[in-house]
Amino acid sequence: MSATAATAPPAAPAGEGGPPAPPPNLTSNRRLQQTQAQVDEVVDIMRVNVDKVLERDQKLSELDDRADALQAGASQFETSAAKLKRKYWWKNLKMMIILGVICAIILIIIIVYFST
């Protein structure tokens, strides 16, 4: 090795060509502010999410109430329909009996009229 190579100044570390580095306190404060801003953003997002969850819960409760009311109405309709069906079945049966009696009377009249 030559003597000039030994006396050459050491190579500058990469990145030292720009402005001087900020003091460590300033860098810490900047990082702290960035972190605080991120935390604030996350808190805002979580507040919005909680509000949405509460709205969803309220809507689900309303939907559940409406479903219960609909179920009660359906049950009442089913009962009313069964009663109405039975009522008209009896009316139909009465009509068939009356029609049968009328046919029997007409048949008896015809038999009596032609047998003499």
From Swiss-Prot:
Q: Is Phosphoprotein one of the keywords?
A: yes
The way it spans or sits in the membrane comes to: Single-pass type IV membrane protein
Q: Which SUPFAM superfamilies match?
A: SNARE fusion complex (SSF58038)
Q: Where is this region: Disordered?
A: 1-33
Q: Which GO terms describe its biological process?
A: calcium-ion regulated exocytosis; cellular response to insulin stimulus; eosinophil degranulation; exocytosis; Golgi to plasma membrane protein transport; long-term synaptic potentiation; membrane fusion; positive regulation of intracellular protein transport
What ranges does the record give for the region Required for interaction with SEPT8, renumbered to this chain?
A: 92-116
Looking up InterPro entries in the UniProt record yields: Synaptobrevin-like, Synaptobrevin/VAMP, V_SNARE_CC
Coiled-coil segments: none
Please list the residues that carry the modification N-acetylserine: 2
Q: Which PANTHER family match?
A: SYNAPTOBREVIN FAMILY MEMBER
Q: Describe, as the record does, how this protein assembles with itself and its partners.
A: Part of the SNARE core complex containing SNAP25, VAMP2 and STX1A; this complex constitutes the basic catalytic machinery of the complex neurotransmitter release apparatus. Recruited to the SNARE complex following binding of the SNARE complex component STX1A to STXBP1. This complex binds to CPLX1. Interacts with POPDC1 and STX4. Interacts with VAPA and VAPB. Interacts with WDFY2, PRKCZ and PRKCI. Forms a complex with WDFY2 and PRKCZ. Interacts (via N-terminus) with KCNB1 (via N-terminus and C-terminus); stimulates the channel inactivation rate of KCNB1.
Protein family (similarity comment): Belongs to the synaptobrevin family.
Disease affiliated with this protein: Neurodevelopmental disorder with hypotonia and autistic features with or without hyperkinetic movements: An autosomal dominant disorder characterized by axial hypotonia apparent at birth, global developmental delay, intellectual disability, seizures, and autistic features. Involuntary hyperkinetic movements are present in some patients.
Please report the name of this protein according to its UniProt entry: Vesicle-associated membrane protein 2
Question: What organism is this sequence from?
Answer: Homo sapiens
The organism's lineage?
A: Eukaryota, Metazoa, Chordata, Craniata, Vertebrata
Q: Which gene holds the coding sequence for this protein?
A: VAMP2
